[in-house]
């Protein structure tokens, strides 16, 4: 059972100064895989063991999950793994902007909390400002991977990424959904979905060489797509 929290509440809107890679990993020079909304972090634990050539950072808005994940990390002594509590839409942009060029090489957003009602659209994890921060940090060819088992969750993410013009899908990937997970370890939610024989909707993107769109123009264009004028959408609450 997912325990939702409202990312728009005052507590979660307080920006946090996140530690630099030098404070998180034994070798901060390794490429970073950033997993946004890592939940209990078991997938990243296994990835850190399989990919010692990378540093793996999981961020999660539910503090108890972060505490448990970090406790496991310490017991396992995974020095290329760390977990941080934060609201990704409030605290990640500055952290990513401070990274050395091409340090961040993969961003994943896997099975995010399903805020699929229109009136809850501002609670979704992938907002235009976060997407632009990711696009500004990733060098051409570096990857953004998104997946969900809820079409009403994945469809807006895909629409926003493609509206930005900053990312392309690999030519060889199936449309509309990639057949498999490019990561060698499934998340806990993904395992659950697979056990039930249900579909998972996946898209892998690679940063292209297009410049970032104007943030205000992207926001306006996104509102037109995500909140058509003829839809009566009550305020968030």
Swiss-Prot record:
Coiled-coil boundaries: none
GO cellular component: tRNA methyltransferase complex
Entry keyword tRNA processing: yes
Molecular function GO labels: tRNA (guanine(46)-N7)-methyltransferase activity
Keyword check for Methyltransferase: yes
Pathway membership, UniProt: tRNA modification; N(7)-methylguanine-tRNA biosynthesis
Catalysed transformations (reactions): guanosine(46) in tRNA + S-adenosyl-L-methionine = N(7)-methylguanosine(46) in tRNA + S-adenosyl-L-homocysteine
Top-level taxon of origin: Bacteria
Active site per database record: 113
InterPro entries: SAM-dependent_MTases_sf, tRNA_(Gua-N-7)_MeTrfase_Trmb, tRNA_methyltr_TrmB_bact
Swiss-Prot/TrEMBL keywords: Methyltransferase, S-adenosyl-L-methionine, Transferase, tRNA processing
Cystine crosslinks: none
Catalytic EC class: transferase
Job description of the protein: Catalyzes the formation of N(7)-methylguanine at position 46 (m7G46) in tRNA.
Family per similarity comment: Belongs to the class I-like SAM-binding methyltransferase superfamily. TrmB family.
Entry protein name: tRNA (guanine-N(7)-)-methyltransferase
Lineage, broadest ranks: Bacteria, Bacillati, Cyanobacteriota, Cyanophyceae, Synechococcales
Gene from which this protein is expressed: trmB
């Amino acid at each position: 059972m997912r325990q939702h929290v409202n990312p728009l509440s005052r507590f979660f809107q307080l920006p946090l100064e996140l530690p630099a890679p030098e404070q998180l990993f034994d070798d901060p020079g390794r490429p970073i895989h950033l997993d946004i909304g890592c939940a209990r972090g078991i997938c990243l634990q296994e990835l850190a063991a399989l990919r010692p050539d990378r540093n793996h950072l999981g961020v999660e808005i539910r503090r108890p999950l972060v505490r448990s994940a970090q406790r496991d990390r310490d017991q396992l002594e995974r020095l290329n793994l760390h977990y941080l509590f934060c609201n990704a839409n409030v605290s990640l942009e500055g952290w990513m902007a401070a990274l050395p060029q091409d340090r961040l090489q993969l961003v994943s957003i896997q099975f995010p909390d399903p805020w699929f009602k229109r009136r809850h659209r501002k609670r979704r994890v992938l907002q235009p400002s976060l997407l632009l921060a990711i696009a500004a940090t990733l060098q051409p060819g570096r990857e953004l991977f998104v997946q969900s088992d809820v079409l009403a969750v994945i469809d807006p993410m895909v629409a926003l990424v493609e509206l930005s013009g900053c990312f392309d899908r690999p030519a060889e990937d199936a449309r509309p959904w990639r057949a498999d997970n490019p990561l060698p370890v499934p998340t806990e939610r993904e395992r659950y979905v697979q056990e039930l024989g249900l579909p998972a909707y996946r898209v892998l993107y690679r940063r292209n060489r297009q410049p970032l769109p104007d943030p205000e123009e992207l926001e306006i264009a996104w509102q037109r797509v995500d909140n058509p004028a003829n839809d009566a959408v009550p305020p968030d609450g």
